[in-house]
């Protein structure tokens, strides 16, 4: 994980959030956590589809997905509602849709406040534990945000109801985007809180891995530098990892996000996307992608991060 200077550690923040959520204080906590001033917003303009990258909390990302043709927008994981509404106002768009990847407080914890601040929002998600849910979705459910198509991809493992959102414009020349929450990170993947190595293999290789190679990957957290340090440990001879790590350090030093990546890139440096590669299997001392996934995830969970 990557931490801002002088900020709460990720574990401390998560523990604090969980404790407050148990006491019904989640929204109150989220309202006072404004640690993202050190990280910049980023607008990715892909023609008629724009994505505003909105840093949140310590290392989360929210994403405002804009159809420039109709000026309609969706928000992915709006944990800081006022920041979302300010961004929508800045772009002059109508926010109609909430896309929730999973129920964890740092992704879904702003839903209930947001629907109070702006009425009429459609709130999508794949888990009844998601606050303010209006539309429960399943694998391959589809919806529209203006002229943009949104396909819902079930990726259970980090949580049992985790959904990734694949967004494209029919007939458009711009590359599609996928919003992966805590399933796929830049150079990493989420912990297996409610699932298995087999499920994560299916999620990464069979569901996400079969999307177009130029698909932009927008993940839920800024964990890139530490993910790449672990990837370097797994494959020390992989030049793609070294190059991406140097690039990520430069981005982080000037406060810029390291998202998006692309699926094609992830297959070159993400050890969890590379569990079929001999170099990763040899490191794990396994010969099967699923057992390699299990071994590499266990090692990552216990990995002592170098300070470089």
UniProtKB/Swiss-Prot annotation:
- Describe, from its UniProt entry, the tissues in which this protein is expressed: Testis.
Which residues, renumbered to this chain, carry the PTM N6-acetyllysine? 116, 229
| Gene Ontology terms, MF aspect | hydroxyacylglutathione hydrolase activity; metal ion binding
Q: Which GO terms describe its cellular component?
A: mitochondrial matrix
Q: Where does Zn(2+) 2 bind?
A: 106-107, 182, 221
- List ligand-binding residues for substrate: 191-193, 221-223, 297-300
Q: Name one GO biological process term.
A: glutathione metabolic process
Reaction(s) this enzyme catalyzes, per UniProt = an S-(2-hydroxyacyl)glutathione + H2O = a 2-hydroxy carboxylate + glutathione + H(+); (R)-S-lactoylglutathione + H2O = (R)-lactate + glutathione + H(+)
Q: What class of enzyme is it?
A: hydrolase
UniProt keyword Cytoplasm, yes or no: yes
Q: Name one Pfam family in it.
A: Lactamase_B
Give, as in the UniProt entry, the pathway in which the protein acts.
Secondary metabolite metabolism; methylglyoxal degradation; (R)-lactate from methylglyoxal: step 2/2
Q: Where is the transit peptide?
A: 1-13
Q: Which UniProt keywords apply?
A: Acetylation, Cytoplasm, Hydrolase, Metal-binding, Mitochondrion, Transit peptide, Zinc
Query: Which residues make up the binding site for Zn(2+) 1?
Result: 102, 104, 158, 182
EC number in record = 3.1.2.6
| PTM annotation (N6-succinyllysine): residues | 229
SMART domains reported in the protein's UniProt record: Lactamase_B
Instruction: Tell me the cofactors it needs.
Output: Zn(2+)
Give the signal sequence positions.
none
- UniProt remark on cofactor binding: Binds 2 Zn(2+) ions per subunit.
Its quaternary structure? Answer: Monomer.
Family under the similarity heading: Belongs to the metallo-beta-lactamase superfamily. Glyoxalase II family.
Report the protein's function. Thiolesterase that catalyzes the hydrolysis of S-D-lactoyl-glutathione to form glutathione and D-lactic acid.
Protein's name according to its UniProt entry: Hydroxyacylglutathione hydrolase, mitochondrial
Species name: Macaca fascicularis (Crab-eating macaque)
**Gene that codes for this?**
HAGH
């Amino acid at each position: 994980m990557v931490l801002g200077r002088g900020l709460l550690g990720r574990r401390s923040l998560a523990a604090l959030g969980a404790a407050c959520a148990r006491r019904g204080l989640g929204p109150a906590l989220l309202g006072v956590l404004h640690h993202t001033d050190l990280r910049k917003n980023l607008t990715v303009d892909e023609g008629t589809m724009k994505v505003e990258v909105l840093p949140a909390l310590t290392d989360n990302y929210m994403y405002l997905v804009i159809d420039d043709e109709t000026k309609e927008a969706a928000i992915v994981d709006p944990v800081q509602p006022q920041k979302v509404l300010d961004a929508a106002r800045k772009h002059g768009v109508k926010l109609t849709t909430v896309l929730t990847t999973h129920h964890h407080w740092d992704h879904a914890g702003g839903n209930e406040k947001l629907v109070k601040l702006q009425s009429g929002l459609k709130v999508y998600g794949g888990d009844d534990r998601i606050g303010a849910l209006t539309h429960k979705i399943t694998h391959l459910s589809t919806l529209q945000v203006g002229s943009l198509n949104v396909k819902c991809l079930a990726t259970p493992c980090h949580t049992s109801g985790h959904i990734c959102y694949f967004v494209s414009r029919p007939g458009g020349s711009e590359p599609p985007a996928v919003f992966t929450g805590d399933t796929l990170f830049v150079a990493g993947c989420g912990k297996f809180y409610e699932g298995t190595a087999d499920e994560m293999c299916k999620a990464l290789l069979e569901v996400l891995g079969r999307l177009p190679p130029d698909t932009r990957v927008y993940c839920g957290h800024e964990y890139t530098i530490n993910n790449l340090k672990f990837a370097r440990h797994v494959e020390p001879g992989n030049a793609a990892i070294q190059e991406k790590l140097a690039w990520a350090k430069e981005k982080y030093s000037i406060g810029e996000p390291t998202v998006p990546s692309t699926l094609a890139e992830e297959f070159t440096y993400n050890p969890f996307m590379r569990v079929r590669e001999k170099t990763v299997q040899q490191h794990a001392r396994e010969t099967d992608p699923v057992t390699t996934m299990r071994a590499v995830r266990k090692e990552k969970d216990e990995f002592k991060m170098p300070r470089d």
